[in-house]
Amino acid sequence: MNNKSSITALMSSFGRAFHTENEEHPVFEDHLAKKLMTAEEYAAVQGYILDGVQFFEPELDPAKQEPTELLHRIVNVHIAPSPLCRAAYTEQALKAAALTGTKQYVILGAGMDTFAFREKEFLAKHRVFEVDHPLTQTDKRERITRTGWTVPGNLAFVPVDFTKDNLTECLITAGFDPSVKSFFSWLGVTYYLSAEAIDTMLTALSRLCADGSTIVFDYPDEDFFDAREKRVQNTIMMAKAGGEPMQSAFSYKELEKLLEKHGFLIYELLTPDDIQKDIIDKAGADMKAFEHVNYCLAVRKDKFGSFHADNL
């Protein structure tokens, strides 16, 4: 595997690709995900998952099931639910926001996201900014070149090393306009950040967001770290073993207070039950929403403290 691409990013791409190809009723379709991976990487991730069946599902006997059946189960139960459902929710919310004046889309921690290459009609009318670590972004651009894709004119790559770079300065230098209504996706990140780091990011987002701008992110609830569900425990253990331990979780009240501190109001919050009903069951997919993980859509309130839903 390319050492510049984390196993997390490759697993996410594999999950998108495998789900798209093998699920009769997919939650989220990404026909480009596989193209960003080499055949060797795809096979390596597949082997990694099959080798870990006993970790994911100790009661399963790999010798008694076909590899494709095992992969389908592990992907749909352990690998794909969070990345796929949050992507489906975010892109649906983005398109709704675009109908009411949103002009810019910022993907924080873009990784191997393919939105800018799947949604050409959106790119024709809106600017998209992919923010990620310089090494990760260099690797992705090499992959894009290898596939022969043309980078859309309205897509800007914004390399940011959060240990030393200023997000606001980097985005504005790349052409971001903080006076324009924007949409920020911040997916799969809050788990790994300290409360202080999350507070710092929200400070930056507050300065970047014009009134009525939107941020969408996923986060673990207050019971996450004490959860008894096996796949939640596995996720916590894998993160720790990979050197990126999960650190933060929030109750609704804690999250509401934190967002209000930075000028954001919660417009919509999806619990696992909501995700199951509104995303998975609606698609007809064979999947269960990840326990203790919520999705939050928050909107920047105006300078006078009032807020109107029609500003979304």
Where are these regions (language model features)?
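Rossmann-like AdoMet
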Residues: M1-V106, M112-V158
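Glycine-rich phosphate-binding loop signature in dinucleotide/nucleotide-binding domains
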Residues: A97-G101, A174-S182, C209
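Rossmann-like AdoMet/SAM-dependent catalytic core
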Residues: N3-I7, R16, A227-L312
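Conserved beta-strand signature within the Rossmann-like core of class I S-adenosyl-L-methionine
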Residues: L208-D223
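Short, conserved loop/helix-junction motifs that constitute active-site signature segments
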Residues: K120-K125, F176-P178, R207-A210
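A short SAM/SAH-binding and catalytic strip from SAM-dependent methyltransferases
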Residues: A174-A197
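S-adenosyl-L-methionine
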Residues: T145-P178
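A short, conserved alpha-helix within the catalytic core of class I
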Residues: L155-F157, N166-E169, Y192-A210
